[in-house]
Regions:
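Alpha-solenoid helical repeat scaffolds
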Residues: 1-179, 186-238
Length: 238
């Protein structure tokens, strides 16, 4: 019964929107009516028009539109809206909203753009989870210094879902920073072996680093022996 009434009122409401294109209330009613009739694509389209005409002003409306862009797999557009409206303070300055902006940029594979909102969300968070994600984002950018710093802080802040993985990632970032960080990387990998779900991966890393260190030590000893042999004149004059 209600669906029939909605169907009957639809042509009139569509005509009103066409005749009064600046009337916000008609657009809002039409978007809601399309949603009631399970015409989600049409409802989304009307909300896009409303945003382009600055008819969406409330936090919930703006957030809903951004979430619809994410649902329709247009994360870049969602990120643009979230970024603009967070800066304008029409979307609330809250951890979950900054995290959603970061998620939108990450979904769009815009790692660098995800870093500022993810940093804000992490600073608002009570645990280390978002700092760990921030470290992983820096890893995507191959910024090993900042990756290591944020992962280390995530471990320090604690309450992580998977601390063993955090130690593993810390080891990887330290290893990427070069030979002089190898021992600290080895320490992190050994810490990671203490967690059942990470033990196998961490032990592989431990073996790789210890094998590299053993080869370098063998090369060093061989070089020292060669130098000693060259310096020993008695080899050649006896």
């Amino acid at each position: 019964l209600f669906d029939d009434r909605y169907e009957e009122s639809l042509p009139l409401l569509e005509a009103m929107v066409y005749r009064f294109p600046e009337k916000k209330s008609y657009h809002r009613q039409l978007a809601a009516l399309y949603a009631e009739l399970k015409r989600e694509d049409d409802s989304f389209y009307i909300q896009q028009i409303m945003y382009s005409k600055d008819m969406l002003e409330k936090h919930a409306e703006l957030l809903r539109l951004a979430q619809l862009y994410l649902y329709y797999e247009v994360p870049y557009k969602a990120a643009l809206i979230l970024e603009k409206e967070l800066e304008a303070e029409r979307i609330k300055d809250e951890e979950k909203n900054w995290e959603q902006l970061a998620n939108a940029w990450l979904s769009a594979r815009e790692w660098k753009k995800a870093i500022p909102p993810l940093t804000k969300a992490a600073e608002m968070s009570e645990d280390g989870g978002l700092f760990l994600r921030l470290g992983q984002t820096y890893m995507q950018e191959e910024d090993w210094k900042n990756a290591e710093k944020n992962i280390r802080y995530a471990i320090k802040k604690g309450d992580l879902d998977n601390p063993g993985r955090a130690w593993l990632l810390l080891g990887i970032t330290r290893n990427k920073k070069g030979i002089k960080f190898e021992n600290s990387a080895l320490f992190a990998f050994k810490r990671s072996t203490g967690y059942d779900d990470m033990e196998a991966d961490a032990r592989r890393w431990v073996k790789v680093i210890e094998a590299k260190q053993a080869r370098r030590e063998a090369d060093r000893l061989a070089a020292e022996a060669a130098e000693a042999e060259l310096a020993d004149d008695t080899i050649y004059f006896n």
